């Protein structure tokens, strides 16, 4: 059996899409976080790990850089993944009416310029 490629899951995330782009035939192994990806690779539970290293919107991904510094890991490939965010609501709503936005911290950081311009 081919060893899996670990990525911080769950399926459907941007890292899952990056893993599929880099390793289209899989298998893919969703794990609980960035450190779990490094642990899986170092324990040989995964052949490779896929982690974000930079965002054109939010800059360097510090946790990935920390893991590369702390552990015996090397970058052996890369892919560029276009990311689009959507601001959605339960019903019709004007941007001026938006009061609270809930999302993953990375997505909030990537959208900080738009969020700062919201009037509410």
Regions found by a protein language model. Give the residues of each.
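Domain-level signature for soluble enzymes in the chorismate/prephenate branch of the shikimate pathway
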Residues: 1-120
